């Protein structure tokens, strides 16, 4: 069964929705773990920058690869995926839950 990437929101689209509705919000990312082969990011999303607790969180794990975006940018890709997951875990999923970037990885396997 195939899938249509156009039915998934990009992280950029989710961010635009978030900032449009929460101009005083805050997004915080943390590199939780990194070694020579992989990294793990956590993102926290806050409705207001002064909120003591996040409204939603998201995690992402990426491995460095020999081809594709993760050959040169697995850390950046991981942070972006983590942010997209945190936004989707709240209300910014725009239909299907995974981001377009995450679903694009399916073709790699």
Regions found by a protein language model. Give the residues of each.
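Basic/polar, acidic-poor N-terminal "presequence/leader" segments
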Residues: 1-23
């Amino acid at each position: 069964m195939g899938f249509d990437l156009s039915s998934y929101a990009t992280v950029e689209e989710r961010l635009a929705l978030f900032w449009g509705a929460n101009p005083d919000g805050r997004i915080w990312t943390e590199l939780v773990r990194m070694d020579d082969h992989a990294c793990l990011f956590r993102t926290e999303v806050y409705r207001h920058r002064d909120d003591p607790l996040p409204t939603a969180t998201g995690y992402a794990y990426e491995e460095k690869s020999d081809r594709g975006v993760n050959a040169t940018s697995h850390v950046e890709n991981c942070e972006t995926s983590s942010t997209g997951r945190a936004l989707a875990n709240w209300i910014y999923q725009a239909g299907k839950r995974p981001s377009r970037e995450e679903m694009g990885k399916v073709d790699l396997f």
